[in-house]
């Protein structure tokens, strides 16, 4: 007997690409890198495998909804009465645990990693860039042959990666660190420490040890600045150093500031021309200029003349700073033209730093501006003349006390009737209005 139910032919294709391959194989299609790609650095650009099953499972939710055939079994005997979707009963603790399951997994993952506790530095103790060691104070070098360097301070000027091509190992990379150390009283040293790749700390420690073995002494004028302006160069780096008065400070390259602090220089101006990124050449040029300078006594002995200072604080009266002792003093007849140079022109090899003139504003040649300058021309020297008269005590200073005394005297003359009292605001007299 034939069945009265209609026959409907359906196709259930549950075999596809995702069913044929396992999870690791599917992840490999996204994370794998070829051998040539690994050599070109593509390994670091690939994303890691994500454990998706730990955070989300198909058909699961905090409400524990049961789908027959998905996350719950199908009861063949009760298919007619069984609901395709039902909510399982849960206690409050189970609901709370299911709601915070993902958060708990993330917290466990974060606590499993070791966090690097970096010491928070004061802004004045930070280096050139963020939390890097370059530019920070590194303390004293290690003792050498029983000699302690407790009063020394070390600075790291540069850390970089260098490479060398060898015929056995190929291209070998190393870490290079430029380190300078000094006691702040003229004794300092610098060196380049090297170590294997990714051993930055080892390279700095090696540089500190080498710098402590290569110390040099720099003569400081008044313990704060250089004796004379000098010019020095190394490769494509040119340095113009100029002495400055007390309290001027350090106005120079950031690397040169650390070198000056290590040596003990407090007041100086240094102009760097050419390459400012080659820190080793910059250091070598500056130190060479410091070592080649001579003191005032050495200059007096070499030239056979008095070294004289003329300061505006003494009204430019000459004061002898150094005199020759072992050399015969020259007379006016034996002086040459080269001996009559100023101290600023005596050194520097005839080189001067480039000083670009200040560019004129766009309105400098306009008609209105020229007309305004011409109207101010008769009063061009009044301010400087007033300052000179006050400085020479030709005119008394118009201070607050002097203005108050003048006001009191005029008030007294007006109250006694010696001077007429002014009528109105800024008017000499008031003219009455005529009657019509």
UniProtKB/Swiss-Prot annotation:
It comes from the Eukaryota. Its main location: mitochondrion. It is found in: Mitochondrion. One of its GO terms (molecular function) is RNA binding. The keyword Ribosomal protein applies. Pfam families: Ribosomal_S5, Ribosomal_S5_C, Ribosomal_uS5m_N. Residues 152-218 form the S5 DRBM domain. InterPro entries: Ribosomal_Su5_D2-typ_SF, Ribosomal_uS5, Ribosomal_uS5_C, Ribosomal_uS5_N, Ribosomal_uS5_N_CS, Ribosomal_uS5m_N, Ribsml_uS5_D2-typ_fold_subgr. GO terms for cellular component: mitochondrial small ribosomal subunit. Component of the mitochondrial ribosome small subunit (28S) which comprises a 12S rRNA and about 30 distinct proteins. This is Small ribosomal subunit protein uS5m. It comes from Caenorhabditis elegans. The lineage of its organism: Eukaryota, Metazoa, Ecdysozoa, Nematoda, Chromadorea.
């Amino acid at each position: 007997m034939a069945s009265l139910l209609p026959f409907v032919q359906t196709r259930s294709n549950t075999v596809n690409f995702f069913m044929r391959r396992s999870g690791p194989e599917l992840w490999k299609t996204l994370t794998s890198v070829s051998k040539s790609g690994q050599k070109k650095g593509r390994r670091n650009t690939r994303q890691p495998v994500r454990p998706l099953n730990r955070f989300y499972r198909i058909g699961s939710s905090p409400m524990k909804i049961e789908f027959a055939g998905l996350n719950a079994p199908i009861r063949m005997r009760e298919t007619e009465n069984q609901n395709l979707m039902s909510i399982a009963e849960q206690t409050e603790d189970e609901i709370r645990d299911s709601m915070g399951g993902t958060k708990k997994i993330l917290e466990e993952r974060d606590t499993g990693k070791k966090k690097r506790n970096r010491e928070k530095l004061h802004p004045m103790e930070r280096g050139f860039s963020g939390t890097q060691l370059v530019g920070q104070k590194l303390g004293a070098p290690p003792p050498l042959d029983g000699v302690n360097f407790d009063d020394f301070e070390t600075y790291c000027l540069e850390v970089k990666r260098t490479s060398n091509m060898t015929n056995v190992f190929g291209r070998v990379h190393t870490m290079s660190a430029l380190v300078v150390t000094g006691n702040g009283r003229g004794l300092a040293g610098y060196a380049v420490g090297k170590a294997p790749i990714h051993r930055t700390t080892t390279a700095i420690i090696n540089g500190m040890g080498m710098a402590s073995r290569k110390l040099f002494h720099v003569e400081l004028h008044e313990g704060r600045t250089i004796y004379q302006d000098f010019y020095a160069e190394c490769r494509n780096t040119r340095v113009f150093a100029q002495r400055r008065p007390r309290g001027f400070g350090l106005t120079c390259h950031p690397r040169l500031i650390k070198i000056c602090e290590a040596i003990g220089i407090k007041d100086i101006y240094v102009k760097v021309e050419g390459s400012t990124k080659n820190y080793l050449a910059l250091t070598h040029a500056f130190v060479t200029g410091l070592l080649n300078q001579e003191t005032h006594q050495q200059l007096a002995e070499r030239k056979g003349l008095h070294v004289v200072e003329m300061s505006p604080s003494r009204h430019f009266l000459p004061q002898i700073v150094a005199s020759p002792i072992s050399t015969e003093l020259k007379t006016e007849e034996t002086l040459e033209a080269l001996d009559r140079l100023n101290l600023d022109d005596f050194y520097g090899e005839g080189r001067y730093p480039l000083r670009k003139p200040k560019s004129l504003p766009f309105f400098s040649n306009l008609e209105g501006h020229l007309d305004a300058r011409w109207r101010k021309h008769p009063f061009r020297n009044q301010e400087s003349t007033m300052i000179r008269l006050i400085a020479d005590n030709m005119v008394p200073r118009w201070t607050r006390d002097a203005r108050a005394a003048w006001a009191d005297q005029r008030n007294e003359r007006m109250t006694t009737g010696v001077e007429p009292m002014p009528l109105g605001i800024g008017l000499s007299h008031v003219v009455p209005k005529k009657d019509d």
